[in-house]
Amino acid sequence: FFFIVPATTEISTLSLHDALPIFRTVGGEGALRQHFLDMGIIPGAEVTMVKYAPMGDPVEVRIHSYELTLRLADAGRIVIDEMRDAVKEKEQPDAKAIPHPGFGEGGKYHNKAEEHPLPEGELLSFALAGNQNCGKTTLFNQLTGSNQHVGNFPGVTVDRKDGEIRGQKNTLVTDLPGIYSMSPYSSEEIVTRNFVLNEHPRGIINIVDATNIERNLYLTMQLMELDVPMVLALNMMDEVRENGGSVLVNQMEERLGIPVIPISAAKNEGIDELVAHAVHVAKYQEKPGRKDFCEANDHGGAVHRALHAIMHLIEDHAARADIPVRFAASKLAEGDALILEQLALDENEKEMLEHIVCQMETERGLDRAAAIADMRFNFIEKVCRETVVKPKESREHVRSTEIDRVLTGKYTALPCFAGIMAAVFFLTFHVIGASLQSVLEILIGKLTELVDSAMTAWGVNPVLHSLVIDGIFNGVGSVLSFLPIIVTLFFFLSILEDSGYMARVAFVMDKLLRKIGLSGRSIVPMLVGFGCTVPGVMASRTLPSERGRKMTILLTPFMSCSAKLPIYAFFTAAFFPKYSALVMVLLYFGGIFMAVLMAMLMQGTLFQGEDRKSTRLNSSHPSRSYAVF
């Protein structure tokens, strides 16, 4: 299939759209390296350079049919073998779509005699889990009818959200943060893992982006190892069909051993069937029929033998710790220190575990973490090869690519950013927001005059009269008059966020912001800070790095929010009446300058010596947003 050139190179040296190379070694350590592997950057995987950021860093690469952004410093840890011959196309199954049968498959994977239905009236709790940007929050809204924010920036679901499934009494679904794996390195992953392990939901609803199944199934496999009843919701199937693709759902069900339901959360298609299957597997506690993802003869059976040996070794410990033994075994095999601590193995057992894992590494020719990741992606490749017909490139993707050439182009990205933000602030402070503010001020003024006249006519006590007119109407009214500006600014920022432009700005600005110790994703809270500092600080919770969150929170107040406008206006009118516009601009840029100065100061003092390693890699849907770490 491949011709590999003996010479090797670093991924960061590839030219745009270079011939598909193969990863040879993956460097890094700890969380960084584990995230490399979880995202599919494993020895033997194919990669294509897609683009460089306007400032040359980070870069976007394509792997496993999806895009990733990598900083050059991290990309330099990955060594590749260059491959100059074309890659042979993989055979795909027949594209003829097979309709998914309706509900009525209850007990398909288990003997009815072995089923033990839960008592009537018992609460059926569900964990809604999936990758970021796969439509999880949209599905949660369809299931519960709640009005939760649906955004397009990775990490929009930070807190836990609960709701009862509409039309189903005694049910509770929890919307968990979007994650890519069950590795315990980010706050989102820890929240999701602890919820499933500690709160014991009766079932899991795993939502998968049908346009990018290969990426999403990595999390699915780890959820199946938890041995909790689950269903798989194939979301965005309407997009797959419209672009000539299909999924052989019944075959996928047989391969995975769990119900697979095609849906479109945005169009409310297939939701009733999904609910019926979810309630059924939870009520009858039908656990996944498959948790072993490697055959005894795969790569000599090294991983298969190691996992089963570890399961036999830790079976009693896993039962006492209330951790599914298969999940614990795979996590121990890849070096999960938290699981090792929870199992409380004695020294002899730890030595035996290390011997088993070292033997696996020797036989497989890969280190422990890479061997487990490779096992999972090999299984995913088999499933997709047998059941998935990839859709053609959609018109939306083509259009998005053309727009990206301008918005993230080397010479056009920064001018576009300046122009777009200038347009947003001009429309906010001089056109729409200012007009609405004037209307509101007139209405408040008319209402103040009306109440003032009425209280004067009624002979109200002067103290009470002054409290109402001067305190409430003039005081609170002056604050309310800025509400249209705040609402207008957030309206435009939400459009930029939902369109994916904010994520592209993070891709463009990452190198610049890293010079002051921040990441490209910090640009979003800071831009929101121009509207109001409070939501800007709250938006910093989406940042995966604790250091980045702290610095962003401390620097966001330096942005000139709308609450500072009346103060600026008062002083400029009093001291610089002829140059008020210029002084206002200088005050805005002065705040930015002070933020940069304080960031550089904090790097050498408050945050000196703190871990500055790169945070989680995020994938991005080709037609949606970039996800910069």
Residues covered by each model-derived region:
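Interfacial loop/helix-cap signal at membrane boundaries in integral membrane proteins
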Residues: 355-389, 394-404, 438-480
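Conserved G1/Walker A P-loop phosphate-binding module
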Residues: 102-181
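Alpha-helical membrane segments and immediately flanking helix-loop junctions
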Residues: 517-565, 572
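Canonical P-loop GTPase G-domain recognition
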Residues: 240-292
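Short, small-residue-biased leader/transition segments that mark boundaries at the very start
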Residues: 6-20, 617-628
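Transmembrane helix-loop junctions at the membrane interface of multipass transporters and ion channels
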Residues: 558, 562-585, 603-604
